[in-house]
């Protein structure tokens, strides 16, 4: 493939943007090489500035569950733009969005719109601290909840790509308020609560880890955390920025049958626009300003154009059979990847929950952060580039989940698997 224009743009970008990008994982630091620059997207495809086409399994990191540039979403945005870009005042679409989220996710009796997943998680933790009068939180190794200071302790996503356990600039006194657990460690969770449970405001967790690749919870693990939180008076926060409306219509909490106190959302509820939200029990949400004393605000929160895009996307995922078809397509891809790797003599396993999946270069079933980071990263990186050269774009990090969309039909998946068979053969050489 020719990448001359992308190469020139990246060289220019590096003089203007830190690392040449506006989010670290986009720089290909983990896999090596240089990123391509996208000119447009449609359905399951990205098209770069050098006119190369890629089958896309990143999906803008999750929002594009119905494929890129879906006509219903695009038309909703065009209609909204005709009425103005931002009002700085309430609009009807905000109410409709709140009605939709509270109907689809019953644990959210009230919601507050924000502009990103990071804002949502920061706001949810502030609410938990204010409501409980406690300061400590518990998170999990490899779980990423945005770039808030409290979360950059044994974080996933770009923090794993950079190979550092936390970030400079986070005060030690603040990070000391964040305790960490190993995901899927039942005994460790019980022991930590026995030690500090009376000080814990909240447990925040990705119910399916999506930022140390894709790691599902073991049977009963989320319920175990629910029980511990209830016993010790802590709140349970599900970070469903990634899993919300993707692994099931009601998110991971519906899929696993566990009810959190607070939930954070993003990605799909924006339909590709910058949107986040947090919601939960009415008695908690009524403590948020101006109804209560716990402050949170945002100039562009509830933006009418973003609400229009998100509502259109949420209409699409409510179509009968949407999530069943999405899960079946993801299973077809994962099974095909494992078969292709096996035929090449390469150890690969996959994890899948609904329309999320993970590819691990190992013989073992991956159930923890430690197992994810012990996989053969060199082989993954070679596979990534071999697939990219064949027009298939996987997440440019071994520590990121993959995302299926409803635009990935059987022909697209078969083309992906044909490329994978060749790519695995390259890796095996």
From Swiss-Prot:
Reactions this protein catalyses: (S)-4-amino-5-oxopentanoate = 5-aminolevulinate
N6-(pyridoxal phosphate)lysine: residues bearing it: 267
Cysteine pairings via disulfide bonds: none
Keyword Cytoplasm: yes
HAMAP family: HemL_aminotrans_3 (MF_00375)
Record CDD domains: OAT_like
Protein name: Glutamate-1-semialdehyde 2,1-aminomutase
Family to which this protein belongs: Belongs to the class-III pyridoxal-phosphate-dependent aminotransferase family. HemL subfamily.
Species classification: Bacteria, Pseudomonadati, Pseudomonadota, Gammaproteobacteria, Lysobacterales
Molecular-function annotations in GO: glutamate-1-semialdehyde 2,1-aminomutase activity; pyridoxal phosphate binding; transaminase activity
EC number: 5.4.3.8
């Amino acid at each position: 493939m020719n990448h001359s224009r992308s190469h020139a743009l990246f060289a220019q970008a590096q003089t203007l943007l830190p690392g040449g990008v506006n989010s670290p994982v986009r720089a290909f630091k983990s896999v090596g090489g240089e990123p391509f620059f996208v000119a447009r997207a449609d359905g399951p495809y990205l098209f770069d500035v050098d006119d190369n086409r890629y089958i896309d399994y990143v999906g803008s990191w999750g929002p594009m569950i119905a494929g890129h540039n879906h006509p219903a979403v695009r038309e909703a945005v065009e209609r909204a733009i005709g009425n103005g870009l931002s009002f700085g005042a309430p609009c009807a679409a905000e109410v409709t969005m709140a009605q939709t989220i509270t109907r689809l996710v019953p644990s959210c009796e009230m919601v507050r719109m924000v502009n990103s997943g990071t804002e949502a998680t920061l706001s949810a933790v502030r609410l938990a601290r204010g409501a409980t009068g406690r300061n400590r939180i518990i998170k999990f190794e490899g779980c990423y909840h945005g770039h808030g200071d409290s979360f950059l302790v044994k974080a996933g996503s770009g923090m794993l790509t950079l190979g550092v356990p936390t970030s400079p600039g986070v005060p030690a006194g603040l990070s000391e308020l964040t305790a960490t657990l190993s995901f899927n460690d039942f005994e460790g969770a019980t022991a930590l609560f026995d030690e500090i449970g009376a000080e814990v405001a909240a447990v925040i967790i990705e119910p399916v880890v999506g930022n140390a690749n894709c790691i599902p919870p073991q049977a009963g693990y989320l319920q175990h955390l629910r029980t511990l939180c209830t016993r010790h008076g802590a709140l349970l926060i599900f970070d469903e920025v990634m899993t919300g409306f993707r692994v099931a219509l009601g998110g991971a909490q519906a899929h696993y049958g566990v009810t959190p106190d607070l939930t954070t959302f993003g990605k799909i509820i924006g339909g590709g626009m910058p949107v986040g939200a947090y919601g939960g029990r009415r008695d908690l949400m009524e403590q948020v300003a101006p109804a209560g004393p716990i402050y949170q605000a945002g100039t562009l929160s509830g933006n009418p154009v973003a609400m229009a895009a998100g509502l259109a996307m949420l209409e699409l995922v409510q179509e009968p059979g949407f999530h069943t078809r999405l899960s079946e397509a993801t299973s077809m891809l994962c099974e095909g990847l494992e078969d292709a790797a096996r035929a090449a003599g390469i150890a690969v396993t996959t994890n899948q929950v609904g329309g999320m999946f993970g590819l691990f270069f190992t013989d073992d079933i991956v159930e923890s952060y430690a197992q994810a980071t012990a996989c053969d990263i060199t082989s993954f990186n070679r596979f990534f580039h071999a697939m990219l050269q064949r027009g298939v774009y996987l997440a440019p990090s071994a520590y990121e989940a993959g995302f299926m969309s409803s635009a990935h039909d059987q022909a697209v998946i078969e083309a992906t698997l044909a490329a994978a068979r060749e790519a695995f053969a390259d890796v095996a050489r």
